[in-house]
Regions:
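Conserved catalytic core of nucleotide polymerization and phosphodiester-bond processing enzymes
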Residues: 1-239
Length: 239
């Protein structure tokens, strides 16, 4: 039985970065949820109606990126993100500056013609899309790429800042970080100090760098005998 929680999670992951019906159906299958096409369309429409900020954000990113590309050297912005295109670097590279100041690079920006596919099969039609060079081949650049990279990159920068604060604080030496996994920090602690460590992790995880002031942030903590993947955001590994 499909729960609203499951569908809501899949919808957020599939649609938040510009995905539509196809992306929702594909991600739902990954979570072993079967959706009919009509049902998926209804979910997409409902999600976008409930999240009007999303399409405004996507279009703002794309407009800023294209405006920067049109005039090399000009800096454009979309909220806290900035873009600049250098035609004399890496074969023509678009840069996106994250709120932290870190730059993401899209080198050798080019238009290309690609086959239109439906249900994984070519239709015989062609379309033109913007693409950039990757380690292996080229990848499409569209508002979904920019949105995903901006959100994931900013989240990673916030997590790195948290890790640095914990690891450089002598008072927290009793809870060494053993690893990070996506949006999780895993510490090794004694069982006697588990509650103390969880409170500290929560405090540190909810402390934003100055450049991230005002961004929404949530945290969940858990202590366990050994690491396991679950629905929590932070874990303290008790020993």
């Amino acid at each position: 039985m499909k729960s609203e929680r499951q569908i809501g999670k899949v919808a957020t992951l599939a649609l938040g970065f510009g995905g539509a019906v196809g992306a929702l159906l594909a991600m739902a299958l990954g979570y072993r949820i079967h959706l009919e096409t009509a049902e998926a369309r209804h979910i997409v429409d409902a999600w976008r109606a409930a999240n009007p900020w999303a399409q405004e954000f996507w279009s703002g990113l794309w407009e800023a990126a294209m405006s920067a590309w049109e005039i090399p050297g000009r800096i454009t912005t979309a909220g806290r993100l900035a873009f600049i295109y250098r035609d004399d670097y890496l074969g023509g590279a678009l840069f996106m500056a994250l709120p932290s100041g870190r730059l993401l690079t899209y080198p050798r920006l080019r238009w290309r013609e690609v086959d239109v596919r439906k249900d994984g099969k070519p239709t015989g039609e062609k379309r033109t899309e913007l693409s950039f060079r990757r380690a292996h081949g080229r990848a499409r650049l569209w508002h979904g790429t920019l949105c995903e990279n901006a959100v994931s990159g900013t989240a990673a920068d916030i997590l790195r800042a948290t890790v640095t604060r914990i690891e450089t604080n002598p008072a927290l030496a009793f809870m060494p970080i053993r690893m990070t996994t996506h949006d999780e920090i895993v510490c090794e602690i004694s069982a006697a100090r588990a509650d103390e460590a969880k409170a500290i992790l929560r405090r540190e995880m909810l402390t934003l760098p100055n450049w991230a002031d005002g961004l929404p942030l949530q945290s969940e903590e858990q202590s366990c005998r050994r690491y396991s993947k679950s629905k929590t955001t932070l874990k303290g590994e008790a020993s």
